[in-house]
């Protein structure tokens, strides 16, 4: 089963490289198992929101910050594994 990961990031802030890095890390960890999409906001929002199958699992807007630590990455990977039924 393909798991959908959607990332909304601040396009006005130049966060696209952060999205690309996250996408690459997740594709390396879960090859051919994810459908990853990204959406840059046209204005400066400061957002970096990660949804797994429609469920918000990481939100910079709500205080999670960037995905810049192993524990933050693990939270996203755990949500993906749960969505896969692992």
UniProtKB/Swiss-Prot annotation:
Cystine pairs: none
GO CC annotations, alphabetized: cytosol
Keyword annotations of the record: Antioxidant, Cytoplasm, Redox-active center, Selenocysteine
Protein location: Cytoplasm
Classification via Gene3D superfamilies: Glutaredoxin (3.40.30.10)
Superkingdom assignment: Eukaryota
Record has Manganese as a keyword: no
Cross-link (Cysteinyl-selenocysteine (Cys-Sec)): 10-13
Pfam families named among the record's database cross-references: Rdx (PF10262)
Gene Ontology terms, MF aspect: antioxidant activity
One Gene Ontology biological process: response to selenium ion
Protein family membership: Belongs to the SelWTH family. Selenoprotein W subfamily.
Functional note: Plays a role as a glutathione (GSH)-dependent antioxidant. May be involved in a redox-related process. May play a role in the myopathies of selenium deficiency.
Protein name (database record): Selenoprotein W
Species the sequence originates in: Danio rerio (Zebrafish)
Designated gene of the protein: selenow
């Amino acid at each position: 089963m393909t798991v959908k990961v959607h990332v909304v990031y601040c396009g006005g802030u130049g966060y696209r490289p952060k999205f690309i890095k996250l996408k690459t890390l997740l594709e390396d960890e879960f090859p051919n198992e994810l459908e990853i999409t990204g959406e840059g906001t046209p204005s400066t929002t400061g957002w970096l929101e990660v949804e797994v199958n429609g469920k918000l699992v990481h939100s910079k807007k709500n205080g999670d910050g960037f995905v810049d630590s192993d524990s933050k990455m693990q939270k996203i990977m755990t949500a993906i594994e749960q969505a896969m039924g692992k």
